[in-house]
Amino acid sequence: MQSAYDLVVIGGAIAGASTAFLLKRQHPSLRVLIIEKTEEFDRKVGESTSEVGACFLTRVLNLSNHLGHEQITKSGLRMWFYRDSHDSYTRCAEIGPKHQTRLPAFQLDRSKLDEAVLNKALRVGCELWRPAKVMDLELGGEGNNRVDVRVNEETRTVSARWVIDATGRNAVVPRKLKLFRPLETHPINAIWARFRKTTDLDGPEIWESAPGFAEPCWAMRQWATNHLMGYGWWGWLIQLKGGDCSVGLVYDQRLFELPPGPNLGERLKSHLMTHPMGKKALCDAECIEKDVHARSNLAYYSAQSMGDGWAVVGDAAGFLDPLYSQGFDFISYTCYATFEILSDRFAGKDISQSRARYNELYQKQFHTWFESIYQDKYYYLGDAELMTVAFYLDIGAYFIGPVGQAYSNHPHRYSELPYGGPIGQLFGKLMRCYNARLAAIAKRRIANGTYGLHNLDSRLFLPGFIPGPASFKFMLTGIRKWLELECKNQLQRRRSDALPGIGQATPLAPS
């Protein structure tokens, strides 16, 4: 059997289905085929959105009804720090919102979301083969692509004017074209699972046993994306619709090694329970069997995002780090930029310049994002004072730039990638600078035994961030705190130089 399609999308989850839906809706006459290998989607990792990704889901894909009925509204980002595993959870330093967040974000059962987006694509006329496996792929340029597909016991061959790779980390096209690149300077691994019977952080047990801990926070801690912070690692607790909780750990291989244990689920739980808040949340929790996953060397990218007759979207284009939940941001940018460029092409326009510009800007964005936010960040993740500075600056810059851009002129702002213009490049330079300095200060603190000294008895409750210039006040606060840190660091260095032997204590690095 052989058929001809204008567009073949390999991968039917959110990245592939979104791009197919947008193109088919814009050009109803296109023949669009989606090839999905699974009979039903699983609950994959990537369960928390940030504000940019949420804007894409609500204002571009118009999924507000699904998100309101089938998913959980996220109660912000919350971080917990500790010094010793015997500390009380009530003493853990905390960073998070004082009250409910002002812009929507969500905690997602990905299997439900992926199915909802795929159904939207089918309703506008896309064709679906499922379960189906791509057996061979020939990329011969626009109009000369061929895909061999196994559907049940039948082998089908299709020709495609364009092929979109939405296969996630499998990255079929980048690997085939030798464009797949591991990001070796960011060697992070992850383990995650779903648990039942986690402690309700807003429940009566907390209010009765620790009213002084519960009372000051007006927001719901339980529905936040809760982060357990440590030296070289961080863990997440994400509540899902129906009562299950996604629990995960991300760590830098250079700084942390997962302790041994009978199985991955027990190793994950055992380690996170060394954190007092993890111990409180997971003390009675039960790991759901056959729902434990691990992945090494998370960070990677494709050296090219679009070529002659092909494009990569979502995680197939690259992935940096789960911290700050920005995976959906990259899905949004790659899907919408690809949609706009291919929409022009299907309308008969020349896209050579826009394709070249997109390839250049994506690489610039990816590497700027890495160098500005994630490079060597795992050195200071476990120090509350350093992460307070980073929180003000990282989140402030995010709301001034990407969030403000998404909400100011949606949806076309998704094809204008952040950090591409002069202002974005200026912010990128500032962010690279403070990120590198915070990592350097952390290394000095580790060496002299002062790492994490402010990890107890501190609460930083922030008002909600809003897009655009209003978030400059958070940036200014962050810059002031950064400069204070630099002064403190210089004074400590001078004292150490003046009095040899001072600062040679055993390093304090929470494990």
Regions found by a protein language model. Name each.
Residues 2-15, 33:
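Beta1/beta-strand and adjacent pyrophosphate-binding region of the FAD-binding site
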Residues 24-45:
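Glycine-rich FAD pyrophosphate-binding loop
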Residues 42-87:
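N-terminal FAD cofactor-binding segment of flavoenzymes
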Residues 89-108, 146, 250-254:
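Helix-loop-beta segment of a Rossmann-like dinucleotide-binding subdomain
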Residues 98-119, 257-262:
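Short beta-strand to alpha-helix junction loop
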Residues 120-278, 335:
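Predominantly flavin-linked oxidoreductase catalytic cores and closely associated redox partners
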Residues 231-233, 239-241, 255-374:
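FAD/FMN-dependent oxidoreductases across multiple families
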Residues 341-511:
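C-terminal helical "tail/cap" subdomain of flavin- and related membrane-associated enzymes
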